[in-house]
Amino acid sequence: MTTLTAQQIACVYAWLAQLFSRELDDEQLTQIASAQMAEWFSLLKSEPPLAAAVNELENCIATLTVRDDARLELAADFCGLFLMTDKQAALPYASAYKQDEQEIKRLLVEAGMETSGNFNEPADHLAIYLELLSHLHFSLGEGTVPARRIDSLRQKTLTALWQWLPEFAARCHQYDSFGFYAALSQLLLVLVECDHQNK
């Protein structure tokens, strides 16, 4: 990626982690449809590989603003996709895709991080990977830890995530009838792919 700074990429990962970790509340719903968010999306679209995914997400948000009981409908989508059985869902856990759930714990230890007691989900939840990537990108921008060390850990995290993210995104597309979380997962997929190629 060329136009986005390490801090901007960190912010995108942190934002996506938040959206995949819990249902949207009224404040978040208002925020994603705000002018400030539209500016942020414009910035993301300046990165050509992200443009189509951001456009799709913006279309979903526009549709969302005219949807009756949008928050309740999105909460139902979130619950159906991420909290139910894996039969018709896109469970946001590495272990649901036959990946080593201990890998993220090792990566967190290597980064000097641990999961928060406030987050009542297993450590292999998608949001934990995204928080770690956000932390690593912020660290790259600060320059306090050798960049080579951070970059090595970033690549390991991206590789571990890429083992199951495409299947997760495909399941979001298959089972999210409204499409908001499908669009989010597509943006994440493209972001991770670009980040992974940016060695």
Swiss-Prot record:
Q: Which organism is it from?
A: Shigella boydii serotype 18 (strain CDC 3083-94 / BS512)
The name under which this protein is listed is Chaperone protein TorD
Report the sequence similarity comment from the record. Answer: Belongs to the TorD/DmsD family. TorD subfamily.
Keywords of the record, alphabetical order, are: Chaperone, Cytoplasm
Instruction: Pull one GO CC term from this UniProt entry.
Output: cytoplasm
Write out the function statement from the record.
Involved in the biogenesis of TorA. Acts on TorA before the insertion of the molybdenum cofactor and, as a result, probably favors a conformation of the apoenzyme that is competent for acquiring the cofactor.
Pfam family membership, one: Nitrate_red_del
Matching HAMAP family: TorD
